[in-house]
């Protein structure tokens, strides 16, 4: 639900009030509580918890299939994270020497939404310090694509996304004569 959320505060952390008034929320944010929103949020959390295991399994399978297809086409493709320890909904891949910004444009024209670099450096106009810190070269950072999988993804659209990524990377390799 809109206008409701959860803030988990570590013991020992002191927060300052940002809205003053009636003293609701332990004096940290006064105003009438959105009871219906809170109940809706609690229900959403319960549903997410019940579905989490199956969703993790589903997303892991989709990500593994996508990686398998891409690796088959590009054995030199770099995966920038430990596939066993990273979030199953997240994938950062790199095609050294390819301009990932051009890939983003080509893929968006086909309905595949991806981003470049790391989320920590998004829209900063500089190379990702996160990818540099894990040892990627400038060419690998410049060729990095970030993909996020979610509840709307399925076998069919992940397969098509993989095909479009392969086409786009091949087109860029041909353009740059690699």
What is each of the regions a protein language model found here?
Residues 122, 126-178:
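PLP-dependent enzyme catalytic core of the Aspartate aminotransferase-like
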Residues 1-26, 30-43:
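Active-site PLP attachment segment
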Residues 89-145:
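Conserved C-terminal alpha-helix-loop-beta "cap" of PLP-dependent enzymes
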Residues 1, 35-38, 45, 63, ...:
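A general structural signal for well-ordered alpha-helical segments in protein cores
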Residues 2, 28, 81, 93-94, ...:
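Thr-Gly-centered strand-to-loop micro-motif
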Residues 45-68, 78-87, 99:
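Structural signature of PLP-dependent enzymes
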Residues 74-76:
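A glycine- and small/hydrophobic-rich beta-loop-beta segment
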Residues 9, 93-97, 149-151:
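Short beta-strand-to-loop capping motifs
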């Amino acid at each position: 639900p809109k206008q409701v959320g959860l803030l988990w505060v570590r013991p020992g952390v002191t927060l300052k009030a940002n809205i003053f008034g009636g003293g609701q929320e332990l004096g940290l944010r006064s105003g009438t509580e959105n009871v219906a929103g809170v109940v809706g949020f609690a229900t959403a959390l319960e549903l997410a918890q019940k579905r989490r295991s199956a969703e993790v399994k589903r997303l892991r399978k989709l990500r593994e299939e996508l990686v398998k297809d891409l690796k088959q086409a590009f054995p030199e493709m770099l995966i920038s994270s430990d596939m066993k320890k990273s979030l199953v909904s997240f994938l950062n891949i790199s095609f050294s020497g390819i301009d990932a910004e051009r890939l983003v444009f080509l893929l968006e024209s086909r309905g595949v939404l991806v981003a470049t670099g790391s989320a920590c450096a998004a829209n900063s106009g500089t190379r990702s310090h996160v990818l540099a810190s894990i040892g990627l070269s400038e060419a690998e950072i410049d060729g990095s694509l970030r993909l996020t999988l979610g509840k709307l993804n399925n076998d069919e659209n992940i397969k098509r996304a993989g095909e479009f990524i392969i086409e786009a990377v091949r087109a860029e390799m041909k353009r740059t004569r690699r």
